[in-house]
UniProtKB/Swiss-Prot annotation:
Disulfide bonds: none annotated. Residues 280-530 form the Methyl-accepting transducer domain. The gene is yvaQ. This is Putative sensory transducer protein YvaQ. It comes from the Bacteria. Residues 208-261 form the HAMP domain. It comes from Bacillus subtilis (strain 168). GO terms for cellular component: plasma membrane. Residues 1-31 form the signal peptide.
């Protein structure tokens, strides 16, 4: 297959486009992976921490309600508390169901099953506490409360393990997100470096296979324009338009050598004939003896000269057509070079925009990591507050038990334990305040989560913009632009030289036509002189004038041919 210049440039830019598409595709895949990991953090690990923490809080609330249930003796109040505790148990079951949907590992599933078993055990003890409270069996109730405390502590251990597991998963997802980003950055840098190397290779290839041959042909054309035909053109082993142009120039030089050499020979012969004609004319004046022989020689010379002029004119027409063809090829190459230059400029602008957008993405991902770390600190604050609530709950438990025991022993006089009851209410208030603190911290955590989502959505938008712009060339386009500009200038010089050579060939054609015309006139004069012998004196004068004119034209032709060096 013939690999023309246009096909070469098409392959070059197709290669660059494929590299840019590869860079953009890797960038999009990496950003999709980052978005997936972010969704995993938000929808799985963070929701898991929130869900399991809320189970811990609701269970503590249920334990507090149990103690309140044993303190009161009013049936309506006990019914109200029982109804509230049933609602809390339904809430616990609902939260367990919701958390189960976020489980993704066997270890987490195993811990969840253990938690479910412990919750069921706690619920069974709870039912017995309610039954003992309604029957006013305080000894049994106290024993059951001790069991619930142990069961609750056991549940807390499992809950803590689940929280740690979710926190570990969140940290792992963050590390994987950063690894994906750094990996994508390395791949992008490698592909950009590869693009630069390929562009440099293309630039060297164009310089060697296109620019240098054009410079050599330009130098040869300059020699031809100066009339130097002695140098042989170096053969170009290329099957594209440059090869065709080089071959046409080689043929042109060969044809010019033949034409110039033949023209020099013809001009010398014409000059010699004109001198002979002048001598013959002078001799004819002194005697008519040699008129017939001289006229025959001149007639033969004029006929030969006319035939030679026709041959030269045909050769010059072929030479002019070859020059026109080479000139048209030069214009086509010049237009192609201009298109390549425009594409190189556009590629430089797009690559600069793409690099700026990748820097913006790097900044946004760093902000997202900081926000996730802040969320981790808030989770630790929640655990501290939960410990405070546990301490208050334990004190409340002891005071409520003491109040219940004393009231049972004192009977009617148990009303004097109002002080203990007041202390219980104060501790209950402390529990309420701690719960409010937990709520506020959880709300702050949710706000941080929304902030993380906003930053990551912003990074995704920037990646999309970067992908749209990463479809063209890299930084090495500037070198290609300079090379193509140099190629275009060189081609223009070649086409200008070809145009000048065309004008010179037209001038030579006109001179040859003048020679043919003079030859025909000379032949007509000779025939007229030969046929009209009685007017020989007058005819010889006319022939002498024609001979002088022919000699002048021959001298002019010799001067023209003298400009060429064979």
């Amino acid at each position: 297959m013939r690999l023309t210049i246009s096909r070469k440039f098409s392959l070059v830019f197709l290669t660059l486009i494929l590299i840019n598409l590869l860079v953009g595709g890797i960038g999009v895949l990496n950003m999709q992976h980052i978005i997936q990991k972010t969704d995993e953090i938000n929808t799985k690990w963070i929701d898991g921490i929130k869900g399991i923490t809320s189970i811990n809080y609701v269970t503590e609330h249920l334990s507090s309600k149990e103690k309140d249930f044993l303190i009161y003796t009013d049936k309506s109040k006990m019914d109200t508390l029982d109804q509230e505790m049933n609602q809390i148990m339904e809430d616990i079951n609902q939260k367990l169901d919701n958390y189960e949907k976020t489980i993704s590992t066997d270890k987490e599933q195993k811990l969840f099953e253990q938690l479910q078993t412990k919750v069921n055990t706690y619920m069974d003890i709870h039912a017995q506490i309610i039954e003992s409270g309604r029957t006013n069996d305080m000894d049994k109730a106290r024993g059951l409360l001790v069991q619930t405390e142990a069961s609750f502590e056991d549940m807390k251990k499992t809950i803590t393990q689940l929280v740690d597991l979710n926190q570990e998963g969140s940290n792992t997802a963050v590390k994987e997100t950063k690894a994906v980003y750094h990996k994508g950055l390395i791949y992008t840098a490698l592909l950009v470096a590869a693009s630069i190397l390929i562009s440099i290779f293309i630039w060297l290839y164009i310089t060697r296979n296109i620019v240098k041959p054009i410079i050599r042909m330009k130098e040869s054309a300059n020699h031809i324009a100066e009339g130097d035909l002695s140098n042989d053109m170096e053969a170009l082993n290329s099957k594209d338009e440059l090869g065709d142009l080089n071959e046409a120039l080689q043929k042109m030089v060969g044809n010019l050598r033949d034409i110039v050499g033949y023209s020099k020979d013809i001009s010398s012969r014409v000059l010699s004939s004109s001198q002979v004609l002048a001598t013959a004319t002078n001799e004819t004046r002194s005697g008519s003896k040699h008129i017939t022989e001289t006229m025959n020689e001149m007639a033969e010379g004029s006929e030969q000269q006319a035939q030679d002029a026709v041959t030269i004119a045909e050769s010059m027409n072929e030479f002019t057509e070859s020059i026109d063809k080479a000139y048209n090829h030069g214009i086509t190459i010049s237009d192609t070079s201009q298109n390549v230059l425009e594409l190189a400029v556009s590629g430089n602008e797009n690559m600069a925009t793409s690099l700026q957008q990748m820097k913006t993405i790097h900044h946004i991902v760093e902000e997202a990591v900081h926000k996730v770390r802040s969320l981790e600190q808030h989770s630790q604050d929640i655990n501290k507050l939960v410990q405070v609530i546990n301490g208050i709950a334990e004190q409340t438990n002891l005071l409520s038990l003491n109040a219940a025991i004393e009231a049972a022993r004192a009977g009617e006089s148990g009303k004097g334990f109002a002080v203990v009851a007041e202390e219980v209410r104060k501790l209950a208030d402390g529990v309420s305040d701690s719960v409010q603190d937990i709520t506020r911290i959880v709300n702050g955590t949710q706000q941080e989560i929304h902030t993380v989502i906003t930053y990551l959505e912003s990074s995704f938008t920037e990646v999309e913009k970067g992908t749209e712009n990463l479809t063209d060339t890299g930084q090495a386009m500037q070198h290609i632009k300079q090379s193509v500009t140099h190629v275009a200038d060189s081609i223009k010089e070649v086409t200008d030289g070809l145009k000048q050579l065309t004008n010179q060939s037209i001038t030579i054609n006109q001179s040859i036509e003048n020679i043919a015309s003079v030859s025909e006139e000379s032949a007509a004069g000779i025939e007229e002189t030969f046929s009209i012998t009685e007017q020989s004196a007058h005819s010889m004068d006319q022939v002498l004038l024609n001979a002088e004119e022919l000699e002048q034209l021959a001298n002019e032709l010799n001067e023209k041919m003298g400009q060429f060096t064979i």
